[in-house]
């Protein structure tokens, strides 16, 4: 029987959508060592401080925390290291031009497996000011209250 295909999400960066306005997203492959893959399969990773950058025509992911593999020996990987991203050349150039434009950064949103291969969802994002964050929270809260009022009205109206 053929294996089931699908995604297994390992880590998400929930703070990114709060701190940044997302412009566009890309899916990139990761160049990892064996112990990093095994540690990710255990669901252990943190994207909170992570960011991506372009250097000499290559994309890199930095400050992503993948803890050491529990059963690893002396051959374990460093916890925080630069990891190469696998993207098409056009995508790298688009990312580089946006970041060079100013005010933009590249943040990881999600780390997951697709058919056994580790992928990361990257976002070109612009930092939010404090008042933007408050306004977003206010809008979300107003929407939640309106939905709650509508659902209670529907229940009482029936």
UniProtKB/Swiss-Prot annotation:
Gene: smpB
Keyword Cytoplasm: yes
One MF annotation (Gene Ontology) recorded for this entry: RNA binding
Cytoplasm in keyword set: yes
Highest taxon of the lineage: Bacteria
Pfam families: SmpB
Location(s) in or outside the cell: Cytoplasm
Record SUPFAM superfamilies: Small protein B (SmpB)
Region named Disordered: 131-158
Known function: Required for rescue of stalled ribosomes mediated by trans-translation. Binds to transfer-messenger RNA (tmRNA), required for stable association of tmRNA with ribosomes. tmRNA and SmpB together mimic tRNA shape, replacing the anticodon stem-loop with SmpB. tmRNA is encoded by the ssrA gene; the 2 termini fold to resemble tRNA(Ala) and it encodes a 'tag peptide', a short internal open reading frame. During trans-translation Ala-aminoacylated tmRNA acts like a tRNA, entering the A-site of stalled ribosomes, displacing the stalled mRNA.
UniProt record, GO biological process: trans-translation
Protein name (database record): SsrA-binding protein
Keyword list, A-Z: Cytoplasm, RNA-binding
Family: Belongs to the SmpB family.
A single cellular component GO annotation: cytosol
Sections of the chain in a coiled coil: none
NCBIfam families named among the record's database cross-references: PRK05422.1 (NF003843), smpB (TIGR00086)
């Amino acid at each position: 029987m053929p294996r089931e295909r699908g995604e297994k999400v390992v880590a998400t960066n929930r703070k990114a959508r709060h701190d940044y306005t997302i412009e566009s997203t890309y899916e990139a492959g990761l160049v990892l060592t064996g112990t990093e893959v095994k540690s990710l399969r255990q669901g252990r990773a943190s994207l909170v401080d992570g960011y991506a950058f372009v250097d000499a025509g290559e994309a890199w992911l930095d400050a992503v925390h993948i803890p050491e593999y529990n059963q690893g020996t002396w051959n374990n990987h460093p916890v925080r290291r630069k990891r190469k991203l696998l993207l098409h050349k056009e995508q790298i150039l688009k990312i580089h031009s946006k970041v060079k434009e100013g005010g933009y950064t590249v943040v990881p949103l999600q780390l997951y497996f697709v058919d056994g291969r580790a992928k990361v969802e990257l976002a070109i994002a612009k930092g939010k000011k404090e008042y933007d964050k408050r306004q977003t929270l206010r809008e979300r809260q107003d929407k939640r209250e309106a939905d709650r009022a509508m659902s209670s009205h529907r229940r009482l109206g029936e």
